[in-house]
């Protein structure tokens, strides 16, 4: 790796750590530079703004999620579970993503949150689309799902994007009222999307699993706890 690329990766690593520790909005470019003992000129050589740096992080997280998904797929031979693994890997509200999700959630319902949601959706869809197309084709060949319409993989990923965003906003609405997560409402919403995906694919009843209920309960509780801490302080 070239020296310039190393410095860029170092900036990304430090920024991600600070964003997760202090929050994105509470972290300034200068905070990042102070850790790196770098100049503003050095920062702006690599990134046009803090927002541009965050966009790069979103693509990095998506690429990392895909790597983890491919590792999981290497150990799974059954077609429907493979599709489930891709859907699970696509979702940012997984146990492994709790730190990053807790950093993003407070911004989602703000005016700038729409741009953030669109940026993350674009990063995830672009990254996961080839593997989703591949796995859907294999499942179709195995007659696990019915022949999907053209561009159905992208439609499915857009649906999953709306799923995690709606879950996050519902969780956030409870936090703003200083309430613990409404487990029943969250599970109802997750089940609504699960059934929609199942119908979209014409998959066997009960075969689609976006994320296990146990893990989602755990993640929702953890995200709620982290988001409530600043309000209690």
What are these regions, as identified by a protein language model?
Residues 72, 76, 104-108, 167-178:
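Secondary-structure edge/capping motif, primarily at the C-terminal ends of alpha-helices
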Residues 7-15, 32, 57-61, 65, ...:
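Generic hydrophobic, amphipathic alpha-helix propensity
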Residues 56, 67-102, 149-156, 190:
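Hydrophobic alpha-helical connector segments
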Residues 96-154, 178-180:
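Short secondary-structure transition hinges
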Residues 10, 18-57:
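Helix-turn-helix
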Residues 58, 62, 117-129, 157, ...:
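Amphipathic, non-transmembrane alpha-helical scaffold segments
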Residues 126, 130, 134-137, 141, ...:
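C-terminal peripheral helix-coil segments that are non-catalytic and often amphipathic
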């Amino acid at each position: 790796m070239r020296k310039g690329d190393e410095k860029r990766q170092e900036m990304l690593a430090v920024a991600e750590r600070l964003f997760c520790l202090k929050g994105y909005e509470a972290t300034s470019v200068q905070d990042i530079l102070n850790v790196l003992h770098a100049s503003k000129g050095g920062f702006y050589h690599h990134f046009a703004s803090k927002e541009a740096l965050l966009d790069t992080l979103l693509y990095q997280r998506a690429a990392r999620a895909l790597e983890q998904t491919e590792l999981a797929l290497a150990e799974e031979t059954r077609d429907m579970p493979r599709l489930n693994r891709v859907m699970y890997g696509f979702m940012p509200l997984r146990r492994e993503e709790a730190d990053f999700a807790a950093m993003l959630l407070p911004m989602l319902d703000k005016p700038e949150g729409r741009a953030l949601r669109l940026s993350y959706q674009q990063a995830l869809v672009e990254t996961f689309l080839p593997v989703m197309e591949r796995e859907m084709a294999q499942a179709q060949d195995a007659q696990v799902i019915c022949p999907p319409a053209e561009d159905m993989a992208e439609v499915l990923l857009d649906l999953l994007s709306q799923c995690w965003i709606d879950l996050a906003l519902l969780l956030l609405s409870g936090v703003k009222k200083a309430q613990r997560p409404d487990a029943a409402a969250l599970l109802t919403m997750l089940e609504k999307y699960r059934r929609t995906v199942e119908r979209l694919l014409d998959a066997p009843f009960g075969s689609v699993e976006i994320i296990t209920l146990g893990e989602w309960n755990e993640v929702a509780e953890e995200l709620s706890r982290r988001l409530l801490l600043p309000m209690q302080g």
